[in-house]
Amino acid sequence: SYENTDDLAETARDADELRIFYHIKNQVKYIDGSYEKYTTKFLKPDIAELKFGKISSKAYTGKVLKPAVIVKDGKKKLVNGTDYTVTYNNNKNIGTAAITITGIGEYRGTKTLKFKIVPPKTTLTSKTGKTSGGWNRATLSWKKSAGADGYQIYYSENGGNFKKLTTVSSGKLSRSVRYTTGDTEQFKVRPYKKVNGKTYFGAWSNIITLN
């Protein structure tokens, strides 16, 4: 404890960073000459008030996923096991996973972060041909995405914005489309899965261009 507040002020001026985790004993002198002692308590920093790195969505693998956590107190990067501990929940299946960060050492409190586990990205291929009516035809095929309920197919005409063409079930891994010679049509697909009323989309596949 500091008995001399001048010493404390001088220390604060000289230091780049001053952290006090102890009780400071002080006393107040009243007009009648009596004194009353009191203690000021300085708390450790609450880890929930620090900065955390963003955790992006992770592709489902069938195994537990433990993305790294980044915690910063100003410019200082905290150390797992020294400044905080980490526990993971619901971090295996497609859905929303939780990370609980608990302050230790010079830090207190907890912070919960969340990240999505989504169906893995698929790969799109095409095989071209002709219809009986003379139209150009292509069969779009893609690899199965583990855990997906189905797939969304989007298309773009002549460089325009992508629009949804159709949605197919998980049991179907191809789609026949028609296109016009001279036009440029592009296609892409992404898997999805519904969990507790919420839809989780995987990343887009590569883009197939037909012209």
Task: Tell where the protein language model's regions lie, with residue ranges.
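Solvent-exposed, low-complexity, repeat-rich "mucin-like" stalks and linkers
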Residues: 1, 43-76
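Serine/threonine-rich, repeat-prone extracellular segments and beta-strand-based repeat modules
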Residues: 1-42, 76-110
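Interdomain boundary/hinge segments at the C-termini of tandem beta-sandwich modules
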Residues: 38-44, 115-119, 209-211
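Surface-exposed loop/edge segments in extracytoplasmic proteins
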Residues: 76-81, 160-167, 203
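Pro/Thr/Ser/Gly-rich low-complexity, intrinsically disordered linker/stalk tracts
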Residues: 119-147, 198-211
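Recognizes extended acidic, P/S/T-rich segments that occur
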Residues: 152-182
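Beta-strand-rich modules
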Residues: 177-198
